[in-house]
A protein has these predicted regions:
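C-terminal and inter-domain tail/linker signature
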Residues: 1-125
Length: 125
């Protein structure tokens, strides 16, 4: 499997089902994960799997809204939900020459209040 779109479909399905063996098979040995907003970086397949298993315990779910990909690059928009709330996530992926995920750049925006100066310009949803 080396099409970026197919790799992401398999990645999110494995994450949602907590199928860590399948997820591991999609990752390059030296995968690098970064979350710029939190300034988090995780290096290596084993460390990234541990980050997911230990860092996100409990009953959470992912719903894939959109995946776009071309060649060795792809992006996804997912909704993460747990018992307390839901969060949108936008994630960028780069594949290596073997079609494995080599880099993940993850953005999880938090809800923001609308500035009063723009209230008359937008529709809230």
């Amino acid at each position: 499997m080396n099409d970026a779109h197919q790799v992401l479909v398999a990645y999110w399905a494995a994450a949602e089902s907590r199928d860590w063996d399948t997820l591991a098979g999609l990752l390059a040995e030296q995968v690098v994960y970064e979350a710029p907003q939190a300034r988090e970086r995780v290096r290596g397949r084993a460390a990234y799997l541990r980050f997911n298993v230990e860092g996100f315990p409990g009953d959470w779910h992912l719903n894939v809204e959109r995946i776009v990909g071309e060649g060795r690059h792809a992006a996804s928009w997912v909704e993460f939900s747990d018992a307390s709330d839901g969060y949108p996530g936008v994630c960028f992926f780069d594949l290596d020459e073997d079609g494995r995920i080599a880099r993940i750049t993850d953005f999880w925006p938090t809800p923001a209040e609308l500035p009063a100066s723009r209230a008359h310009l937008v529709e809230r949803y």
